[in-house]
Amino acid sequence: MSLLLLLLACGLTCLGQVAQKFAVESWRGQPSSALQKLRSGWLWLALFSLGLGLLVWLLVLQRMEVGVAYPMLSLNFVFITLIAHFVFREHIDRRHWFGVALVIGGVLLLSRHA
Protein backbone atom coordinates (compact mmCIF):
# COMPACT_ATOMS: atom_id res chain seq x y z
CA MET A 1 0.00 0.00 0.00
CA SER A 2 2.81 2.42 0.88
CA LEU A 3 4.56 1.85 -2.43
CA LEU A 4 1.31 2.42 -4.32
CA LEU A 5 0.81 5.71 -2.49
CA LEU A 6 4.39 6.67 -3.29
CA LEU A 7 3.82 5.92 -6.98
CA LEU A 8 0.60 7.95 -6.88
CA ALA A 9 2.47 10.90 -5.32
CA CYS A 10 5.10 10.59 -8.07
CA GLY A 11 2.45 10.43 -10.76
CA LEU A 12 0.61 13.47 -9.46
CA THR A 13 3.74 15.58 -9.15
CA CYS A 14 4.86 14.55 -12.63
CA LEU A 15 1.43 15.44 -13.99
CA GLY A 16 1.82 18.84 -12.33
CA GLN A 17 5.21 19.38 -13.96
CA VAL A 18 3.94 18.36 -17.39
CA ALA A 19 0.87 20.58 -17.03
CA GLN A 20 3.18 23.50 -16.17
CA LYS A 21 5.16 22.81 -19.33
CA PHE A 22 1.98 22.76 -21.42
CA ALA A 23 0.83 25.99 -19.75
CA VAL A 24 4.00 27.90 -20.58
CA GLU A 25 4.07 26.45 -24.09
CA SER A 26 0.53 27.73 -24.66
CA TRP A 27 1.65 31.23 -23.58
CA ARG A 28 4.64 31.29 -25.93
CA GLY A 29 4.44 34.05 -28.51
CA GLN A 30 1.15 35.39 -27.20
CA PRO A 31 1.00 38.77 -25.55
CA SER A 32 -1.20 37.87 -22.63
CA SER A 33 -1.76 39.45 -19.27
CA ALA A 34 -1.32 37.70 -15.97
CA LEU A 35 -5.10 37.45 -15.73
CA GLN A 36 -5.28 35.63 -19.07
CA LYS A 37 -2.56 33.26 -17.90
CA LEU A 38 -4.55 32.53 -14.75
CA ARG A 39 -7.38 31.29 -16.98
CA SER A 40 -5.20 28.53 -18.39
CA GLY A 41 -6.65 25.09 -17.79
CA TRP A 42 -3.13 23.70 -17.82
CA LEU A 43 -2.13 26.00 -14.99
CA TRP A 44 -5.10 24.92 -12.89
CA LEU A 45 -4.42 21.26 -13.62
CA ALA A 46 -0.83 21.83 -12.47
CA LEU A 47 -1.94 23.47 -9.23
CA PHE A 48 -4.55 20.79 -8.54
CA SER A 49 -2.27 17.84 -9.23
CA LEU A 50 0.65 19.30 -7.27
CA GLY A 51 -1.66 20.03 -4.33
CA LEU A 52 -3.15 16.55 -4.41
CA GLY A 53 0.34 15.11 -4.78
CA LEU A 54 1.35 16.93 -1.60
CA LEU A 55 -1.58 15.41 0.30
CA VAL A 56 -0.71 11.92 -0.94
CA TRP A 57 2.94 12.54 -0.01
CA LEU A 58 1.83 13.31 3.55
CA LEU A 59 0.10 9.92 3.64
CA VAL A 60 3.31 8.31 2.41
CA LEU A 61 5.30 9.96 5.19
CA GLN A 62 2.88 8.53 7.75
CA ARG A 63 3.64 5.02 6.49
CA MET A 64 7.29 5.07 5.43
CA GLU A 65 10.58 6.32 6.78
CA VAL A 66 11.51 9.60 5.10
CA GLY A 67 15.03 8.28 4.50
CA VAL A 68 13.54 5.60 2.24
CA ALA A 69 10.55 7.45 0.81
CA TYR A 70 12.24 10.67 -0.27
CA PRO A 71 15.00 9.10 -2.37
CA MET A 72 12.32 7.03 -4.10
CA LEU A 73 10.81 10.28 -5.36
CA SER A 74 13.71 10.24 -7.79
CA LEU A 75 11.34 8.15 -9.91
CA ASN A 76 10.03 11.55 -10.96
CA PHE A 77 13.33 12.05 -12.77
CA VAL A 78 12.71 8.82 -14.70
CA PHE A 79 9.08 9.61 -15.53
CA ILE A 80 9.78 13.19 -16.59
CA THR A 81 12.69 12.07 -18.78
CA LEU A 82 10.40 9.59 -20.55
CA ILE A 83 7.70 12.24 -20.99
CA ALA A 84 10.25 14.78 -22.24
CA HIS A 85 11.46 12.29 -24.84
CA PHE A 86 8.16 10.79 -26.00
CA VAL A 87 5.70 13.68 -25.53
CA PHE A 88 7.81 16.79 -26.03
CA ARG A 89 10.24 15.12 -28.47
CA GLU A 90 13.24 16.40 -26.54
CA HIS A 91 16.62 14.84 -27.28
CA ILE A 92 18.00 12.79 -24.39
CA ASP A 93 21.67 11.84 -24.69
CA ARG A 94 23.31 8.57 -23.60
CA ARG A 95 24.66 9.96 -20.34
CA HIS A 96 21.19 11.04 -19.36
CA TRP A 97 19.78 7.56 -20.13
CA PHE A 98 22.62 6.05 -18.09
CA GLY A 99 21.64 8.31 -15.20
CA VAL A 100 18.04 7.15 -15.56
CA ALA A 101 19.22 3.53 -15.35
CA LEU A 102 21.21 4.32 -12.19
CA VAL A 103 18.17 5.97 -10.60
CA ILE A 104 16.04 2.93 -11.40
CA GLY A 105 18.69 0.69 -9.85
CA GLY A 106 18.78 2.81 -6.72
CA VAL A 107 15.00 2.78 -6.39
CA LEU A 108 14.96 -1.01 -6.78
CA LEU A 109 17.52 -1.32 -3.98
CA LEU A 110 15.48 0.99 -1.75
CA SER A 111 12.19 -0.77 -2.51
CA ARG A 112 13.57 -3.96 -0.95
CA HIS A 113 13.92 -2.00 2.29
CA ALA A 114 10.40 -0.53 2.15
Curated annotation (Swiss-Prot):
An annotated GO BP: lipopolysaccharide biosynthetic process
Disulfide bridge map: none
Membrane topology, from the record: Multi-pass membrane protein
Annotated Gene Ontology cellular component terms: plasma membrane
Boundaries of every EamA domain copy: 43-112
One matching Pfam family: EamA
A GO term, aspect molecular function: carbohydrate derivative transmembrane transporter activity
UniProt keyword terms in alphabetical order: Cell inner membrane, Cell membrane, Lipid A biosynthesis, Lipid biosynthesis, Lipid metabolism, Lipopolysaccharide biosynthesis, Membrane, Transmembrane, Transmembrane helix, Transport
Transmembrane segments annotated in the record for this chain: 41-61, 68-88
The keyword Membrane appears for this protein: yes
Localization annotation: Cell inner membrane
Pathway the protein acts in: Bacterial outer membrane biogenesis; lipopolysaccharide biosynthesis
HAMAP family (UniProt xref): Flippase_ArnE (MF_01869)
Subunit structure: Heterodimer of ArnE and ArnF.
Functional summary from the UniProt entry: Translocates 4-amino-4-deoxy-L-arabinose-phosphoundecaprenol (alpha-L-Ara4N-phosphoundecaprenol) from the cytoplasmic to the periplasmic side of the inner membrane.
Record-stated family: Belongs to the ArnE family.
UniProt name for this protein: Probable 4-amino-4-deoxy-L-arabinose-phosphoundecaprenol flippase subunit ArnE
Designated gene of the protein: arnE
